Amino acid sequence: YNPYGSQWENMTWGHSTSKDLLHWEFQGEAIEPDVWGTIFSGSAVVDHNNTAGFGDSTVVAMYTTAGENQTQSLAYSTDNGKTFTKYEGNPVITSNTPDFRDPHMFWNEDIKKWNMILAEGQHMNIYSSVDLKEWTLESQFGAEYGNHGGVWECPDLMKMRVRGTDKYKWMLICNINP
């Protein structure tokens, strides 16, 4: 959101809390623009096993910084999300593609690694990491499939149980802009 007005600029992550998911209290800005650019969407995880080395049960956020190029950066919170410290090694993932954004991270228990899905142009990149800082591109999806009338963004990838069975399938959600 833009803390200074309703127009599109100064994109920042805000922080709000709720006890009932109906009534919300604004806690202030969580992650603000820096030399890499404004702060676009991303995701946050709780690093229960301290794989990143920031501390036990640290909240780790990955977000898109939108400057000259879109890059992926990390920030972490050791106080349950009240304040965030930007990782000194930012950005952690770069690309020369103009539309390179919206990281969604999750722990993959099957391979004992973090996974992330990230939109790049009109396809998705799937990465893995053992420490949330160094990421390896594992695969790409979508260049030959689906709708290509706009930029792919805000992906989600989740493992879901097939109803009535002991089997699981992966489900990909993708939004198209415009």
Model-identified regions with their sequence ranges:
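Beta-rich carbohydrate-recognition and catalytic domains
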Residues: Y1-P103, W107-C154, K159-P178
